[in-house]
Amino acid sequence: MPPEVRGNKRAFFDISINGEPAGRIVFSLWNHCCPRTVENFRAFCTGELGKMNGHYASYQGSVFHRVIKGFMIQGGDITHGNGTGGYSIYGRTFDDENLALKHKKPYLLSMANRGPDTNGSQFFITSEEVPHLDGKHCVFGEVIKGVEVVKAIENLETGNEDKPVCKVEITHCGEMVRKGDVVGNAGAAASEPEPTGVKMEDEPKTRNWLMRYSKSPESREEKKKDKHGREEKRDRRRRSNDRHGRDRRSRSRSQSRDRNRRRDDRSGRDGRVGRNERDDRSGRDERRDDRRSAPTKDGIKVRGRGKLTFLGGRTRSTTPPHWKREESKKLTLEAHQKRQEELEERQKRAAQREKEEAERNARLEKERVERQNQRELERQKQEAERELKRQQENEESGNRRRRRSSRSGSENDESELEEPKNRSASPRKRSSSSSSSSSSGHSSDSD
């Protein structure tokens, strides 16, 4: 399929790597094949929608978060920047479109998704032929300029989850239009062909023709002006007839006498003229019948005194190729019913996915609350254990103080008991010493 049949829109990215300008990537968008997908991508390139879902709906400032050499580079996550976010201009996601297009060459622009009918804002640019993605991802454009920039991004060093180590950012983006479309807007009305196949100057002067053309507002205004002009001409003719009526009545008598004289001269020729007139009249009737019975090119019989002849040249635009393709897609009742069933099944799957996602979110929220409660219980338990340990330590310290005080009291009692004993023992010692001295005296006396 030639490029002009696939589409005629252009978009561009200005890329920077680690803050340094790397170049521009220009895309050719296939708006005739995938109009909804192209409009989604184009709106994010221009940023014309402003803020949506709390984020600025534009690729400007977003990054290429995933790079796989020999496969593709991926970007377009305008919310999180890591491949988990993004949304479409039609809502959260939108359905797949024209999955018959193949990934049969490198540097194609395709939509990233998380399954059937989950397209958002993320996209990827292939660097090789990837037939295993056919029927799963929607191809809606190709790179026509800036292949070297794509190769430079592809050859960058990557880390965890194929994220490039260097920051690859879209610093500027937008839609490209042809210079003729911009310059020619001022004179578009003058240079634009008339919207009908019949021009006003081509119309016959008689009112006994059946004309078919689209009644645009301009043609209605011109018709009103022509009607007003015809009325003025009719009034002028009526006034001139009134003015010259008297002269005609005065000349009518002389003209009637002249006609009577000429009638006698023509009497010999009446036979021949009558036959010729009858032949001419019959020929005109046959031609008129032929014109009446002749249908149009489309096979439609037109009421009136003649067939359409003032069609003019083909100045209108040709039928777009995507219209022709749609007109050629005539479906049978069974095919239409099958398509409706597929659409219903797709809607059911989408509803089921939404339901599962809601259940998953509810489950995650419940688990989060349970984990929070569990952490709170563990914290309370730890505080209770610390309080119990503190109480036990206080009790042990009190017991130690009591034992220490009781031990010191018993020692004091023992010391008090020992002092009287010492006092009682000292007189005994003195008496024993005196007795020993007396015994020694007695022994000396005996000697």
UniProtKB/Swiss-Prot annotation:
Residues 432-447 have a biased composition (Low complexity). Pfam families: Pro_isomerase. Residues 235-254 have a biased composition (Basic residues). PROSITE patterns: CSA_PPIASE_1, CSA_PPIASE_2. Residues 12-175 form the PPIase cyclophilin-type domain. GO terms for molecular function: cyclosporin A binding; peptidyl-prolyl cis-trans isomerase activity. It catalyses: [protein]-peptidylproline (omega=180) = [protein]-peptidylproline (omega=0). One of its GO terms (biological process) is protein folding. The lineage of its organism: Eukaryota, Metazoa, Ecdysozoa, Nematoda, Chromadorea. Residues 215-234, 255-301, 323-399 have a biased composition (Basic and acidic residues). Its EC number is 5.2.1.8. This is Peptidyl-prolyl cis-trans isomerase 8. Residues 326-401 form a coiled coil. SUPFAM superfamilies: Cyclophilin-like. It comes from Caenorhabditis elegans. Transmembrane segments: none annotated. It comes from the Eukaryota. Residues 186-447 are annotated as: Disordered. May catalyze the cis-trans isomerization of proline imidic peptide bonds in oligopeptides. May play a role in the protein folding, transport and assembly. The gene is cyn-8. PANTHER family: PEPTIDYL-PROLYL CIS-TRANS ISOMERASE (PTHR11071), PEPTIDYL-PROLYL CIS-TRANS ISOMERASE 8 (PTHR11071:SF427). One of its GO terms (cellular component) is intracellular membrane-bounded organelle. It is an enzyme of class 5 (isomerase). Keywords: Coiled coil, Isomerase, Rotamase. Belongs to the cyclophilin-type PPIase family. InterPro entries: Cyclophilin-like_dom_sf (IPR029000), Cyclophilin-type_PPIase_CS (IPR020892), Cyclophilin-type_PPIase_dom (IPR002130).
